[in-house]
């Protein structure tokens, strides 16, 4: 704990006696914290009750005397409309920068749509190519630290995951371009804005280099999970270049698939998910989607349309989320600076949006830190979870 005069210096410059004094004080503080009997779960980015209450109007948008038809005359209570309500697709079109007729709506989970997309590539192939399961060992690029649930999907299918370091500009594109020369590399996971957990937003050049990729594998897919596209925390939000437009310029639009949802906009358990891509890729996905379902939850889509109206309505709602979230980020960042600033034993992100602060402690210490937090009643994401196979090679990264 940063409580003594000597602790304003980097710890590596301190004497053994100074370090021992800090250790003893830290242990006393730790035992006091343990005695409080706390039970605090910070393992996932879960919206609080106050955030969920911001979208209660979704539940009030429909009632027994409502008009249940959309602008095309489709009765939203019935079967049909395989790709989802046009009005909801138009909202996502504004947010994602892809034409509405190149968007498929799902139910509440974009992760499920990602899983289904990987599953289709594995069992039936991408774009008419041989299914991945018949090509021997296939591989996926995994910018790391990254999203553990992405890695869980590729691990589930036995796809070999290749970690790629995250830089301040996004994934190491030199490495990605080199690895893509291998035809067994079939795709790359991406969280391009306020990346989970680093908070990095991909630079314009990184987005353009993704668009310029010409992988050896013709069935390579960029899984572009734009989960935090409107989740800004400051007056100067990060700007993300539209990858679809860049891919169109390069003639590579078939290989990018964009995902998003209203999970952290309205309700995580009852929102609307979306998938966007080129007309050709959407047509190939339609073949599977129309076998899988006769249509997603149109009543929920209609509720969201009536509540949100358009992309401006989404952005207005997100201001309420910011008012609740930004002070919480400030509490965490102030505590890190107060307790660890200047000691040379940790570094952390200061994101402009998203849901996470990324903390790097000294090499070999992350598991121990997370374990000590657990003993004190604070549950964090497991150390290592932000890397493929749960293996942080440095045992240093912690997602807060």
Regions found by a protein language model. Name each.
Residues 1-2, 16-22, 68, 80-82, ...:
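PLP-dependent enzyme catalytic core of the Aspartate aminotransferase-like
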Residues 2-83, 93-94, 375-378:
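N-terminal "arm"/small-domain region of PLP-dependent enzymes with the aminotransferase-like
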Residues 23-34, 281-282, 286-287, 292, ...:
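Conserved C-terminal alpha-helix-loop-beta "cap" of PLP-dependent enzymes
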Residues 41, 319-333, 345-360, 369, ...:
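Conserved glycine-rich beta-strand-loop-beta hairpin in the small C-terminal domain of fold type I
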Residues 45-49, 110-111, 146-148, 169, ...:
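Short, solvent-exposed loop/turn segments at secondary-structure junctions
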Residues 74-218, 229-251, 366:
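Conserved core of the PLP fold type I
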Residues 187, 221-222, 257:
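Hydrophobic "anchor" residues on beta-strands that sit immediately upstream
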Residues 245-326, 339:
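Conserved core segment of the aminotransferase class I/II
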């Amino acid at each position: 704990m940063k409580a003594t005069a000597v602790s304003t210096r980097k710890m590596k410059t301190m004497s053994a006696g100074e370090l021992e004094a800090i250790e003893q004080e830290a242990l006393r503080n730790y035992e006091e914290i343990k005695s409080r009997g706390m039970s605090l779960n910070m393992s996932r980015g879960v919206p609080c009750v106050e955030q969920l209450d911001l979208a209660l109007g979704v539940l009030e948008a429909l009632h027994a005397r409502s008009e249940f038809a959309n602008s095309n005359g489709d009765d939203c209570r019935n079967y049909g409309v395989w790709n989802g309500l046009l009005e909801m697709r138009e909202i996502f079109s504004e947010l994602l920068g892809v034409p509405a007729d190149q968007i498929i709506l799902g139910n509440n989970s974009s992760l499920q749509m990602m899983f289904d997309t990987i599953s289709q590539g594995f069992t039936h192939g991408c774009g008419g190519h041989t299914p991945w399961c018949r090509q021997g060992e296939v591989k996926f690029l995994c910018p790391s630290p990254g999203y553990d649930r992405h890695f869980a999907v590729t691990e589930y299918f036995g796809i070999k995951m290749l970690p790629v370091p995250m830089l301040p500009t996004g994934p190491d594109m030199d490495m990605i371009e080199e690895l893509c020369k291998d035809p067994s590399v079939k795709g790359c996971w991406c969280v391009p804005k306020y990346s989970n957990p680093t908070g990095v937003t991909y630079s314009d050049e990184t987005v353009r280099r993704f668009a310029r990729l010409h992988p050896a594998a013709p069935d390579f897919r960029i899984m572009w999970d734009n989960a935090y596209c409107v989740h800004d925390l400051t007056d100067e939000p990060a700007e993300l270049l539209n990858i679809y437009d860049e891919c169109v310029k390069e003639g590579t639009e078939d290989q990018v698939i964009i995902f998003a949802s209203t999970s952290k906009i309205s309700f995580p358990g009852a929102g609307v998910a979306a998938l966007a891509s080129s007309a050709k890729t959407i047509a190939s996905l339609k073949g599977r989607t129309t076998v899988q379902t006769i249509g997603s939850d149109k009543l929920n889509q209609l509720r969201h349309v009536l509540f949100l109206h358009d992309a401006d309505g989404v952005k207005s709602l997100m201001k309420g989320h910011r008012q609740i979230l930004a002070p919480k980020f400030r509490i965490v960042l102030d505590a890190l600076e107060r307790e660890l600033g200047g000691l040379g034993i940790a570094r952390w992100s200061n994101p402009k949006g998203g849901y996470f602060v990324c903390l790097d402690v000294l090499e070999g210490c992350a598991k121990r830190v997370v374990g000590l937090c657990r003993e004190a009643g604070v549950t964090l994401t497991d150390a290592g979870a932000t890397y493929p196979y749960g293996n942080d090679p440095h045992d240093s990264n912690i997602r807060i």
